[in-house]
Regions:
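An anion/phosphate-binding loop that grips the pyrophosphate of nucleotide cofactors and donors
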Residues: 91
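Short, surface-exposed loop/helix-turn segments at secondary-structure junctions
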Residues: 27, 72, 101-120
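General small-molecule cofactor/ligand-binding pocket signal
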Residues: 13-18, 131
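Short helix-loop capping/hinge segments that flank enzyme active sites or metal/cofactor-binding pockets
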Residues: 32-85, 134-143
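Short, hinge-like loop/turn segments at secondary-structure boundaries
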Residues: 31-35, 113, 149-150
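Structural helix-boundary/capping segments
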Residues: 1-10, 71-72, 82, 125-191
């Protein structure tokens, strides 16, 4: 991984390890996020009809979550947080993927009802500072990124590490990426 090698070249000690309970955070997120979306859309005059299909899918999934399941997820989140906090007493940062695959083409079918696991869920659920950074493109020109995660209240460290990697990899060429992505859409025109 280029990001890990960059930190290693700068003198950081880099070693593979996984924070405890990350897989459980996705399960907790699969309860808490839909329940939250459901609460938000119930307060909207149109019930969230104008929202992005993926948010509507989360809201629909939230309708079947019981108060008991919600409370159980909140309790488990607290327990997992204690384990992850102990992990960050041994490590300053985690470098990990943002998503389990590279970016999807705009022409790939989007399923509004498929709830994808995200490598960001554990950060969201445990209140950890994280930053997603551009690190290059695939051979097809699709953007690739990584995520830097710090322990609770380590926001400044995450921002500093992000700055270091941005200096090493450069900023994302947004105009060029937008043209590439636009031209990948059937019938799309590059501008």
């Amino acid at each position: 991984m280029r990001a890990a090698n960059t930190f290693r070249q700068l003198g950081a000690r880099v070693q593979p390890d996984d924070p405890p309970g990350i897989d459980r955070c996705n399960a907790i997120h699969a309860t808490l996020w839909p329940a939250c979306c459901r609460q938000l859309t119930e307060g909207m005059a149109d019930g969230g009809a104008a929202l992005d299909p993926s948010l509507r899918a989360y809201s629909d999934a939230g309708a079947g979550i019981s108060r008991q399941a919600l409370l159980g997820a909140l309790i488990e989140r607290g327990e997992l947080g204690a384990g992850v906090n102990a992990f960050f007493e041994r490590y300053d940062l985690v470098i990990c993927p943002v998503y389990p695959r590279v970016a999807m083409r705009l022409t790939e079918p989007q399923s509004g009802d498929k709830l994808f696991p995200h490598f960001t869920a554990w950060c969201n659920q445990l209140g950890l500072p994280a930053a997603s950074l551009y690190t290059g493109t695939t051979s097809e020109g699709l953007p690739v990124g990584i995520q830097i995660v710090g322990g609770r209240h380590a926001d400044a460290l995450v921002l500093w590490a992000s700055h270091i990697l941005e200096l090493a990899f450069g900023r994302a060429p947004f105009a060029e990426l937008a043209r590439t992505l636009s031209s990948s859409v059937a019938g799309g025109k590059a501008h």
